[in-house]
A protein has these predicted regions:
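Beta-propeller-forming repeat regions
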Residues: 4-433
Length: 433
């Protein structure tokens, strides 16, 4: 959602240049460039499943006329008391918050730290002292901006859930994603970084030099990285980085690690459509064959005023065929979708997909904001709308909130466009089955 809500002259020029550029052969070996519409969607439309969840607002409600701008949520037991909590990146109030579940079903929100336009938060024991620290990606400014106002912050936990801020990278391209992993094999945690920027961006990693000192290594200078996920994509035991690059590129890249922090770029997939609208990616073994696949949504429409979806938007999964070759399977044609999460929602042993909608026809009261793609066990999917309120849902996390062993969910609303009649900040969705 970091893309412009009003098309700029610069963006129009970039798109025109891109239309010429895509006719050239710039594919890496093993990569493919295609339009997802060339692959028919495997999902069919099923009935509504609102009875699957009960929902309620958790955390602090909006104040007065506030319109929430929640960029990311995560489910984690931060204080390790056996009850899952919720972490929130609130880009309206410029804070990272903790919605603590102190007793079962009772949620209380408190501010952890002030951060300028936080976009992603990850809980991990970064300093290996036995408690959970937080790695935060910060845009610096929510809306499009070419200034280098991005940062990566580690919030160090003192063991009592009091946090000290360490800015391990500052004044870099607006950061949409940052995740911890040992990328150079020296035993400490480094950080992969998606520097979205605007016209200028970069995918990079931050080498941990000790003493809270980090060195940035730029892997690729393309605008629009949304995700930078550490994962062993080729099965050689070394963590690579897989990046989703949006803007006019609309590509998925792998940076292959030799185990010592030397990462080589390799395109895994690219669209022929420079307006494809990449919105989010997650890595999961979707077909349970032992290697990581990619579940990938293209529902971004924030560059239009008002946000206006396109017919080619939807969700697909890229099947890992080995040797860095991926086969695209279109799952669903659906406008505005983002934040797909693979989860066995119906308990039948295969992975379904839960996802949200940030840009739909909200004047239609039935337009879904939360959807379930039901897997029939043969990788054919049936789409079920779950809810149509709140609207403008940008972020989704899955986990067991009520301790019944079944997957629940949390969503966050990004209400930067009309209508404003079904506003929600943080919503908990509790499985009934």
């Amino acid at each position: 959602m970091t893309r412009s809500s009003i098309p700029s002259i610069a963006l129009i020029v970039i798109v025109l240049v891109t239309l010429v550029w895509v006719s050239r052969d710039r594919l890496m070996p093993g990569a493919s460039r295609e339009h997802a519409s060339e692959k028919p969607a495997t999902a069919v439309s099923g009935g509504a499943t609102s009875a699957m969840f009960t929902s309620r607002a958790i955390g602090d409600p909006p104040k007065g006329e506030e319109r929430p701008q929640i960029a990311h949520v995560a489910i984690v037991d931060l204080d390790r008391d056996g009850l899952n909590d919720v972490l929130v990146c609130d880009s309206l109030r410029n804070v990272v918050t903790w919605i603590r579940q102190a007793t079962r079903g009772t949620f209380t929100e408190s501010v952890i730290a002030g951060v300028s336009a936080p976009a992603h938060v990850e809980a991990i024991d970064f300093d290996k002292d036995g408690d959970l620290d937080l790695v935060v990606a910060a845009l610096g400014f929510l809306f499009p901006n070419n200034n280098r106002v991005g940062s990566v912050i580690v919030l160090e936990n003192d063991g009592q859930q009091k946090f000290r801020s360490h800015y391990i990278a500052d004044r870099i391209a607006r950061v949409a994603d940052a995740r911890a992993a040992d990328l150079d094999g020296d035993g400490d945690l480094d950080v992969s970084v998606a520097g979205f920027g605007y016209d200028d961006g970069e995918t990079s990693w931050l080498e941990n030099k000790g003493g809270w000192k980090f060195e940035q290594h730029v892997l690729q200078q393309l605008s629009g990285p949304i995700n930078a996920i550490p994962v062993d994509i080729n099965g050689d035991t070394f963590l690579d980085v897989v990046a989703l690059v949006s803007q006019e590129w609309e590509e998925i890249w792998a940076f292959i690690n030799d185990g010592k922090g030397n990462l080589t770029p390799r395109m895994l997939w690219g669209s022929t459509n420079p307006d494809f609208g990449s919105s989010w990616m997650t890595m999961v073994d979707m077909d349970k064959d032992g290697d990581p696949d990619i579940v990938y949504a293209n529902g971004d429409a924030f560059e239009y005023a008002p946000p206006n979806s396109r017919p080619w938007q939807g969700v697909q999964w890229l099947e890992n065929r080995g040797d860095l070759k991926f086969e695209l399977h279109r799952m669903i044609d659906q406008q505005g979708v983002t934040s797909p999460e693979a989860v066995d929602l119906d308990g039948n042993g295969d992975l379904d997909v839960l996802l949200v909608n940030a840009n739909n026809d909200w004047d239609n009261p039935a337009a879904p904001s939360l959807l379930w793609l039901e897997n029939d066990g043969k990788m054919q999917f049936t789409m079920h709308p779950i809810a149509s309120s709140p609207t403008h849902l940008l972020t989704l996390a899955v986990g067991d909130l009520d301790g019944d062993g079944k997957p629940d969910a949390v969503t966050g609303g990004m209400h930067i466009s009309r209508p404003y009649d079904r506003i929600g900040c943080i919503t908990g969705w509790f499985t009934r089955r």
